[in-house]
Amino acid sequence: MAYPFQLGLQDATSPIMEELTNFHDHTLMIVFLISSLVLYIISLMLTTKLTHTSTMDAQEVETIWTILPAVILILIALPSLRILYMMDEINNPALTVKTMGHQWYWSYEYTDYEDLCFDSYMIPTNDLKPGDLRLLEVDNRIVLPMELPIRMLISSEDVLHSWAVPSLGLKTDAIPGRLNQATVSSNRPGLFYGQCSEICGSNHSFMPIVLEMVPLKTFENWSTSMI
């Protein structure tokens, strides 16, 4: 999860987030190299009065600064498209969970079970227990099995919301009248926090998301106790 004064990304917990982290580093290195080259050229222009007459009208230079940016854009676009298709690909999900956004709480329905659904509200600050996180704890966590592909169907009952869990690389808009889907998969057990990431009204900041990823056997015991 995030912590105060954090500069980097949250620790990746899903394969998608690992790919996004690698793509971020890849793109950042390209930006760093281009910025260094531009700053070097600017410093030369400011500190010297020398000019190269052939650079004012040179076919070779014009060819290079046309082809090189195209190559750089391709190096950025190809891995980006690969990750984009990976995020949309859902093959044989082990479980499907329907998520509905409301003003200002989330409701969850496990569609593979006959009667397993609940609402998830933020716990008020006055009701927090020692060790709980302010504005992030909920009364009903969504419990999912780890190391299995899970399909999330996301929509909204009223206004625009966005269901986001950064450490899992998830951010999907909840739009009234439209059903979006996302894949959830975790490499390890634990608690993973998120929040509504679309301004949806006066209590937008009070719509936390808490995912509890557990082993399959633990999930089966939990689902049995909830039905």
Swiss-Prot record:
Residues 46-59 are mitochondrial matrix. InterPro entries: CcO_II, CcO_II-like_C, CcO_II_C, Copper_CuA, Cupredoxin, Cyt_c_oxidase_su2, Cyt_c_oxidase_su2_TM_dom, Cyt_c_oxidase_su2_TM_sf. It catalyses: 4 Fe(II)-[cytochrome c] + O2 + 8 H(+)(in) = 4 Fe(III)-[cytochrome c] + 2 H2O + 4 H(+)(out). One of its GO terms (cellular component) is mitochondrial inner membrane. Binds a dinuclear copper A center per subunit. Its main location: mitochondrion. Cu cation A2 binds at C196, E198, C200, H204. Cu cation A1 binds at H161, C196, C200, M207. Keywords: Copper, Electron transport, Magnesium, Membrane, Metal-binding, Mitochondrion, Mitochondrion inner membrane, Respiratory chain, Translocase, Transmembrane, Transmembrane helix, Transport. It is found in: Mitochondrion inner membrane. Gene3D superfamilies: 1.10.287.90, Cupredoxins - blue copper proteins. PROSITE patterns: COX2 (PS00078), COX2_CUA (PS50857), COX2_TM (PS50999). GO terms for molecular function: copper ion binding; cytochrome-c oxidase activity. It is a multi-pass membrane protein. Residues 1-14, 88-227 are mitochondrial intermembrane. Its cofactor is Cu cation. Mg(2+) binds at E198. The chain crosses the membrane at residues 15-45, 60-87. Its EC number is 7.1.1.9. Component of the cytochrome c oxidase, the last enzyme in the mitochondrial electron transport chain which drives oxidative phosphorylation. The respiratory chain contains 3 multisubunit complexes succinate dehydrogenase (complex II, CII), ubiquinol-cytochrome c oxidoreductase (cytochrome b-c1 complex, complex III, CIII) and cytochrome c oxidase (complex IV, CIV), that cooperate to transfer electrons derived from NADH and succinate to molecular oxygen, creating an electrochemical gradient over the inner membrane that drives transmembrane transport and the ATP synthase. Belongs to the cytochrome c oxidase subunit 2 family. NCBIfam families: CoxB. Component of the cytochrome c oxidase (complex IV, CIV), a multisubunit enzyme composed of 14 subunits. The complex is composed of a catalytic core of 3 subunits MT-CO1, MT-CO2 and MT-CO3, encoded in the mitochondrial DNA, and 11 supernumerary subunits COX4I, COX5A, COX5B, COX6A, COX6B, COX6C, COX7A, COX7B, COX7C, COX8 and NDUFA4, which are encoded in the nuclear genome. This is Cytochrome c oxidase subunit 2. The gene is MT-CO2.
